[in-house]
Curated annotation (Swiss-Prot):
The gene is pynG. InterPro entries: FAD-bd, FAD-dep_Monooxygenase_BioMet, FAD/NAD-bd_sf. The keyword Oxidoreductase applies. Belongs to the paxM FAD-dependent monooxygenase family. Transmembrane segments: none annotated. One of its GO terms (biological process) is secondary metabolic process. Pathway: Secondary metabolite biosynthesis. It is an enzyme of class 1 (oxidoreductase). Its cofactor is FAD. It comes from Aspergillus niger (strain ATCC MYA-4892 / CBS 513.88 / FGSC A1513). This is FAD-dependent monooxygenase pynG. Disruption phenotype: Leads to the accumulation of pyranonigrin I. Its EC number is 1.-.-.-. Keywords: FAD, Flavoprotein, Monooxygenase, Oxidoreductase.
Amino acid sequence: MSTQVLIVGGGIGGLTLAAMCRRIGVSCRVLERSAALEPVGAGISLAPNALRALDQIGLYDYVRQEGQPVRKIRVYRNQTQWSEIDFQWLERTFGYPVYSIERHGFHRRLYDAAGGSETVNLGAEVAKVIPPQEEAEGVSVVLKDGRRYTGNVLVGADGVRSVVRRALMATINSPPGQSGAVGEDEDAADVIQFTGRVHLSGYTHPLDHLGPADEGIAYWMLYDRSILTTWPCRDHRQWFVGAVPSKLKDPNRSVWKHADHNTINQVYGSEYHPFAPDFHFRDVVKHAERVVASDVFHQTTFPPMAAGRIAMLGDASHAMTSFFGQGACQAIEDATELASALGMIDVRPTDAETILQGYRHSRERRGRDLVVFSDRFALLHTGRLLGSWGPFVRQMVYTWMPLWGWKWALQWLYGHQPTLVEQRNEAAKKTA
């Protein structure tokens, strides 16, 4: 079965790319290993650098309807409030605020925008990637059940343990004309590393004791032995995520099985939180409709984001910690730039490899910068930046940094807003 673009992975990045391909008339097929779209994760943060692209494909109205804009972030050290960071200026400056939204609902909406079952094959686990042996051929994948798909371009959106990334590396390392099939069990130099931390997160039912004054207020809680963030969501729901050192002997898994409310309470149940009815976080955890525990990985080396007719996006290319909520946003940025490139390939198919190299060069520096930024912010937030000076540096930043400092620090992040090539062409026509 052939198509213009084969996308391996039906997460945020893969489905965003598929929705954009559909928008510009490029045929695609998404292969997702999960058998169903089940709730995975808790919440998601969508910032201005991703929202402009979502606005272009008609998804911003959904985000506005189902999400909650963040107005302020209150920073606490144990029970003492250090500061309140204003976020209401973001929309005036960048055109969009930061939204917190329930992840599964947003994922389902992306699935629909991508074309649903007409585009997305669920239960389609890739076992082998077969690169082209001649320039005119496409790239093929073979599923575990034996089905075979071929595309003019193959895109890896399959996360930190990407089978497509291994195929891309094999394409780079093999002599011309000798690149063979690459399977999921092939040995390859690992480019991701376990950070030693586990994220404990959850998404609550509406908290009836919260009122209008609580809308849009996030909390950064800096405890002695852990940290915790609560993000406001629609209808006074809360998305919480904490980070603690992991005690696992085997860090080779991403999502823990059998995590429950007690998993969260063992770490955070007795900790102070300003909006908990008795000021203990267990009173929030008991309202969680689901909880998740997952190990945290980040990128250590960066393979090229494109080689031959294979391209990468999101965590498959630049896995990062979630300390500033940019993982999904960067996948959306990647998808926007890649969709623009795929639109060009649709017009000039013989230039596919050259055009993908253009995508590679437009995204690699940005992705690497975000990995470094996320790592450094994690060090700042946990009081470990600059070694023994870490606690002092953290307190100085969170208690003394003026608003103009935050505006300066976030300009490079939120001011970068990729646009789909279709929209660029329309803008050029209007100004011509």
